[in-house]
Amino acid sequence: MEDLLVEVRLDNGAYYKGQVTAVADDGIFVDVDGVPESMKYPFVNVRLPPEETVEVAAPIFEEGMEVEVFTRTNDRETCGWWVGIIKMRKAEIYAVAYIGFETSYTEICELGRLRAKNSNPPITAKTFYQFTLPVPEELREEAQKDGIHKEFQRTIDAGVCNYSRDLDALIVISKFEHTQKRASMLKDMHFRNLSQKVMLLKRTEEAARQLETTKLMSRGNYVEEFRVRDDLMGLAIGSHGSNIQAARTVDGVTNIELEEKSCTFKISGETEESVQRARAMLEYAEEFFQVPRELVGKVIGKNGRIIQEIVDKSGVFRIKVSAIAGDDEQDQNIPRELAHVPFVFIGTVESIANAKVLLEYHLSHLKEVEQLRQEKMEIDQQLRAIQESSMGSTQSFPVTRRSERGYSSDIESVRSMRGGGGGQRGRVRGRGGGGPGGGNGLNQRYHNNRRDEDDYNSRGDHQRDQQRGYNDRGGGDNTGSYRGGGGGAGGPGNNRRGGINRRPPRNDQQNGRDYQHHNHTTEEVRETREMSSVERADSNSSYEGSSRRRRRQKNNNGPSNTNGAVANNNNKPQSAQQPQQQQPPAPGNKAALNAGDASKQNSGNANAAGGASKPKDASRNGDKQQAGTQQQQPSQVQQQQAAQQQQPKPRRNKNRSNNHTDQPSGQQQLAENVKKEGLVNGTS
């Protein structure tokens, strides 16, 4: 910069120090002391300062010599070089009279303020050389820094080398002509070195920041250091270091360092809480949880719904179910327990703890539910065992089962009062085929395998009932049934009142064929059945009596099988089942019937009941009535009764004709009509 020093003469005639800032064709821009801004001055007003020489002795000033005095006219002005003549000299004090003023002005000056008159001529256009060097765009920002071109300026002997934003170039000013030539040779090298210098400067600045951070870290009170497993470093760092950047933004965290070789994080912070928060974001781990094998499916859930919910709520990165023991792909590093499957949790330590809490709670719930289910199964087994032991042959049907017809079924309530004679454990209300072999103990209402040909059997056909184990009305058994009546001592006691799959009654042709099935060889069994019907009719309600009487009246014109007639009536429309008006028979017929069958009834009841201990009051009343009316029986009826007893009965079934004899159909029809009339009169 000293090469660009000049002296500029201002309007007052004095020369002032200045520095060249730019060179123009008709002048030069100089920054003069005492002038606010750089201004352009003509070349004639500018000169170079005198050369400074090393003088061995002080200069000798004599009187009358022209000298230049460094002074000023007032205190507000800047000092400049003024021309004067020495008037008097005394030691080192000189009296100088200034030249160029209208009035003479003399001043006493010291030796240090004096110098010899400057003999340099004014400068010209070739005194200073100025040229520009364009700067690459990528280096313009760095070229503006102060002192960055200092070495380049010294090498080319330039007085000044500055970057101009207006020109985007380096402005070089020098007193030497060779400066421009050197600059042309070195500019490429200078700009290449400048780019390297910029990179080094950036590294220097980064190092300075690290130094500052280190100083701040040294002032920090809390430091946490932890290690992350090698295979989990990617999760800890995050995508493009996102996790580390997020941890650095935590309030109070001053520094986070990572040693990649040892996979160690070092966190420094102002408070312990901030350091712990940053550690929770970076510390990834892997832990195992043993789940019972039988609960693995329930823990995972349908389509993985339960395990996915645990992942979402806990924030864990991944839950992996390890391969089951025995598989080829199982990891040997995973600890295993007997009858357990390890679940592998991968994520931050905090998220793994949350996942364990959720999984433990779900497992405790599953175990509790399984325990309740086992208790319920044990109770069900005990209940089933008690029902089987108490119900016996009822096949564990609930005791409290009600009739399917509901409470309002009067017909069902009336029918439930019927039933055969009681056995050892049968109901007293029952009636029907008692004896040693009556009934098989199955309720037809709950069984599907009953035979259609049994739907229309006679109520007193004991031999066939004993063989097949069925009872028409009550069945009977030593155990009985919920709805059934009586039964014998030996049979299981089936109730013929139908079940869920009860078949519809047969047509008239089938019913007509059923009338002909007979297994008894004597008329005594038939008479016993008819007399039992009379006794029961006396003891039933008015509804039962009228219903039975209508069925007897319907059967007066057909074969004399009581149950068959009832079955035929059931198949007819309801309009055809209206009670028919009957002519009351003569009292003699009733008396003859009761007297002729008294002894047969007693013997039939004895055989049917098998020594039953519960006779009915209706049977005793029937015996008294028969004894009273026996004397009034006409002789004609007795003869017909005797003829009927002497003649054999017709065959009921050709396949069972071994124990039966033929009987004319006319006599059989006559005898049955007489008996029916007596039965109807007896029940009216």
Swiss-Prot record:
Ribonucleoprotein in keyword set: yes
GO function terms (MF aspect): DEAD/H-box RNA helicase binding; identical protein binding; molecular condensate scaffold activity; mRNA 3'-UTR binding; mRNA binding; mRNA regulatory element binding translation repressor activity; N6-methyladenosine-containing RNA reader activity; RNA binding
Domain Agenet-like: from-to ranges: 1-49, 65-117
Tissue and organ expression note: Highly expressed in testes in the early stages of spermatogenesis before spermatid individualization (at protein level).
Any one GO cellular component localisation term in the record: neuron projection
Region (RNA-binding RGG-box): 474-489
GO biological process: adult locomotory behavior; animal organ development; associative learning; axon guidance; axonal fasciculation; axonogenesis; brain development; cellularization
Subcellular location: Cytoplasm, Cytoplasmic ribonucleoprotein granule; Cytoplasm; Perikaryon; Cell projection, Neuron projection
Positions of modified residues (Phosphoserine): 403, 408-409, 413, 532-533, 539, 541
Bias (Gly residues): 418-441, 476-493
Compositional bias annotation for Low complexity: 555-581, 588-613, 625-648
Domain KH residues, every copy: 221-282, 284-353
Transmembrane domains' residue ranges: none
Record annotation: effect of changing residue 291 to K: Strongly reduced binding to N6-methyladenosine (m6A)-containing mRNAs
Keyword Transport part of the UniProt annotation: no
Effect the entry attributes to changing residue 311 to K: Does not affect binding to N6-methyladenosine (m6A)-containing mRNAs, while reducing binfing t unmodified mRNAs
Region annotation (Disordered) ranges: 386-684
SMART domains named among the record's database cross-references: KH
Family named by the database record: Belongs to the FMR1 family.
Record remark: domains: The C-terminal disordered region undergoes liquid-liquid phase separation (LLPS) for the formation of a membraneless compartment that concentrates mRNAs with associated regulatory factors.
Subunit architecture: Homodimer. Interacts with AGO2, Dcr-1, Rm62, vig, RpL5 and RpL11; these interactions form the RNA-induced silencing complex (RISC), a messenger ribonucleoprotein particle (RNP) complex involved in translation regulation. As part of the RISC complex, interacts with Tudor-SN. Component of a neuronal RNP at least composed of Fmr1, tral and me31B. Interacts with piwi and vas; these interactions occur in the polar granules. Interacts with Cyfip. Associates with polyribosome. Interacts with Ythdf; the interaction is RNA independent.
Name recorded for this polypeptide: Fragile X messenger ribonucleoprotein 1 homolog
Organism: Drosophila melanogaster
